[in-house]
Design a protein with these regions (language model features):
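Glycine-enriched alpha-helix->loop->beta-strand junction motifs that scaffold or abut catalytic
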Residues: 63-71, 88-94, 119-122
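Divalent metal-binding pocket/active-site signature
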Residues: 1-80
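Acidic (Asp/Glu)-rich catalytic clusters
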Residues: 38-41, 83-89, 116-120
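Divalent metal-coordination and catalytic microenvironments
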Residues: 51, 71, 94, 128, ...
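Extended C-terminal subregions enriched in glycine
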Residues: 74-77, 92, 96-106, 135-138
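Short acidic/histidine-rich active-site segments
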Residues: 47-55, 121-139
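Mid-to-C-terminal alpha-helical segments outside catalytic/metal-binding sites
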Residues: 78, 146, 152-190
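Histidine/acidic-residue-rich catalytic or RNA/ligand-binding cores of hydrolases
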Residues: 56-67, 81-86, 104-114, 133-146
Length: 190
């Protein structure tokens, strides 16, 4: 007899919500099944990139590491170095939104974005709730402009962030190859 902590989704009858890991597993499993079907029909596939590590338990970051292509936010990685190291080793994409975090969770000067970038984690800049947190008509340009000014990012730094953004995107390989070059998966310089 196998005991389970949680029942299958079809048998969930608790008035409480299931934990984040439960939701994430079922999203992962269903997206994987859907992607298999889409591949057989020569269609593009989907990636799982949840909101994770902005608030909540650091355990969410472990669940996302095991199931996801990348995550949005990840600021809690600053509190759990061993999980941060796993994200570094596997180069799991972190689409970070320091301006959004500044309004809700963490002031800009305490945001780990730049620290993660200097350590070599696969970070990019993104927008989160641009209608709520942006002051311009170009919220992504705003994120890049503020980060460039605050952290004194060089042109090379900005190019690396843009490259990371392309790598993290859900675009097919031929699109990435067009924007990043035929050797875009190759590490180092030529």
């Amino acid at each position: 007899i196998q005991s389970r902590k949680y029942p299958p989704a079809s048998e969930w009858n608790s008035i409480s919500n299931p934990p984040y890991s439960y939701y994430l597993y079922y999203l992962y499993a269903n997206i994987a099944s859907l992607n298999n079907l889409r591949l057989k029909n020569n269609m593009n596939t989907f990636v799982l990139r949840p909101h994770c590590g902005e608030a909540g338990d650091p355990e969410h970051l472990i669940s996302a590491f095991l199931t996801s292509y990348g995550i949005s936010h990840g600021i809690l990685l600053r509190k759990v170095p061993f999980i941060q190291y796993l994200y570094y080793l596997d180069q799991i994409g972190l689409a970070m939104s320091p301006l959004s975090n500044n309004a809700l969770f963490l002031t800009y000067d305490k945001n780990p974005f730049y620290n993660f970038f200097k350590k070599g984690l696969n970070v990019s800049l993104s927008t989160d709730d641009p209608l709520q947190f942006s002051y311009t008509k170009e919220p992504l340009i705003e994120e890049y402009s503020v980060a460039a000014q605050i952290y004194k990012l060089s042109g090379v730094d900005m190019c690396e962030l843009a490259r990371n953004s392309c790598l993290q995107s859900g675009w097919e390989a031929n699109i990435k190859k067009h924007w990043l070059g035929k050797n875009y998966m190759k590490g180092g310089v030529e």
